[in-house]
A protein has these predicted regions:
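Ligand-binding loop in jelly-roll beta-barrel domains
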Residues: 95-119
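Short acidic-glycine-tyrosine-enriched beta hairpin
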Residues: 48-49, 72, 78-95
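Short, conserved beta-strand element in jelly-roll/cupin
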Residues: 47-48, 59-74
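Histidine-centered catalytic micro-motifs
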Residues: 55-61, 96
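A short, N-terminal "cap"/entry segment at the start of jelly-roll beta-barrel domains
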Residues: 2-45, 83, 91, 107, ...
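Extracellular/periplasmic catalytic domains that process cell-envelope and extracellular macromolecules
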Residues: 36-38, 58, 66, 103-107
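Structural recognition of the beta-strand scaffold that forms the well-ordered cores
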Residues: 56, 65-66, 75, 91-92, ...
Length: 127
């Protein structure tokens, strides 16, 4: 009986921890002014749980992405989605509505470099 209780408690706690984990998380690792007035560079690591996505959005500048781990389906505007795997990269033009979704079964990670207008939000949800 005690073993069954411990197993049940472990399952419940595991479910709670999994439920609290966000499906997408962006962590800024570096930010600096550029020599071009009004522009800055921001580097961030995006972590996507399976099925995770930031949702359709834009940036006030270019995004250069490099897949560190996993598989992402990237949509740009009305174009068909393109699948990118670890070791591949892509460029998103300034103001382009886009989205990325982890289509794999494990965590996907991306290193994203943004060359953006200083003082503007890094990402703006698409309308």
């Amino acid at each position: 009986m005690r073993t069954a209780t411990v197993i049940a408690a472990t399952l419940v706690l595991g479910t709670i921890v999994a439920a609290q984990q966000p499906l997408f998380k962006r962590t800024v690792v570096q930010q600096a002014d550029l020599s071009t007035p009004g522009r800055e560079v921001i580097q961030a690591v995006g972590e996507f749980q399976p099925g995770g996505t930031p949702g359709r959005h834009t940036h006030a500048g270019e995004e250069v992405g490099y897949i560190l781990e996993g598989t992402l389906s990237v949509e740009q505007g009305d174009k068909p989605a393109v699948i990118f795997k670890a070791g591949q990269g892509f460029v998103i033009p300034a103001g382009q509505i886009h989205n990325a979704t982890n289509t794999g079964t494990g965590v996907a990670k991306i290193l994203a470099t943004y060359i953006v207008e200083k003082g503007k939000p890094l990402a703006t949800p698409a309308k």
